[in-house]
Swiss-Prot record:
GO terms for cellular component: cytosol. Belongs to the TACO1 family. It comes from Campylobacter lari (strain RM2100 / D67 / ATCC BAA-1060). InterPro entries: Integrase-like_N, TACO1_YebC-like_2nd/3rd_dom, TACO1_YebC_N, Transcrip_reg_TACO1-like, Transcrip_reg_TACO1-like_dom3, YebC-like. One of its GO terms (molecular function) is DNA binding. This is Probable transcriptional regulatory protein Cla_1081.
Length: 235
């Protein structure tokens, strides 16, 4: 997904009151990370990043602690990571990441959203080769020497570092998530959010009118309780 389009989406979300949707999704990410890698953030980079992302979005500590506790509970839901691939209006490519305790419900909802908003679901594997799976860290702007920071992070798996007026973004291969997370923490950089993302290999430009059509589908997907993230090939 292109940087300009990311900020367009971010500013749009900032105008909407989405906390009622956001906090449960952040809690679900924390719960899954804790269940997969253990409840100790010091030993679990994914959990550590999920917690940092939640804090950056002003999620209360009680909510964070409750999500971690649910992961180790006897009655904790079996939440699965699922992804779907599809096309929006004007041929925009979309990968949808979900966390769900009921995949049957989730796939039905996602299919309905695509079909009702000018899109279509594709067979999994149809689009993933057009994207790269990356560890992506979104951070507050860095005021130090970027070249020096880049050199310091290369050994941890850094592939790309870029900064604009909004944030610093650090990218590495998905297998380097843990190492990069540890290296970033040692640098005392301020994390806004982090995770594994699908980045388009060849982003495509769309007109303003086309983007409005595409965003109708994106908005509906992002509003679904089971959808954690939506990635596109929009430049």
């Amino acid at each position: 997904m292109g940087r300009a389009f990311e900020y367009r989406r971010a500013s749009k979300e900032a105008r909407w009151d989405k906390m009622s949707k956001l906090f449960p999704k952040l809690a679900k990410a924390i719960q899954v990370a804790a269940k997969e890698g253990g409840a100790d953030p010091d030993m679990n980079p994914k959990l550590r990043s999920a917690i940092a992302t939640a804090k950056a979005n002003n999620m209360p500590k009680d909510n964070i602690d409750a999500a971690i506790k649910r992961a180790s509970g006897k009655d904790s839901a079996d939440i699965k990571n699922i992804h779907y691939e599809g096309k929006a209006a004007h041929g925009a490519l979309i990968i949808v990441e979900c966390m769900s305790d009921n995949p049957t419900r989730t796939v039905a909802n996602v299919k309905a959203i695509f079909s009702k908003n000018g899109g279509e679901i594709l067979q999994n594997g149809s689009l993933t080769f057009m994207f790269s799976h990356k560890a992506v860290f979104h951070l507050e702007k860095y005021n130090g020497d970027l070249e020096e920071l880049e050199l310091d992070l290369i050994d941890a798996g850094l592939e790309e570092l870029d900064q604009d007026d909004e944030e610093l973004r650090i990218i590495g291969d998905y297998t380097a998530f843990g190492e990069l997370s540890n290296a970033i923490e040692k640098k005392a950089l301020v994390l806004k959010k982090a995770g594994l993302e699908y980045l388009a290999n060849n982003p495509v430009s769309f007109s303003e009118e086309q983007l409005l059509d595409i965003e109708k589908l994106l908005d509906k997907l992002e509003d679904d309780d089971d959808v954690q993230a939506v990635y596109t090939n929009i430049e």
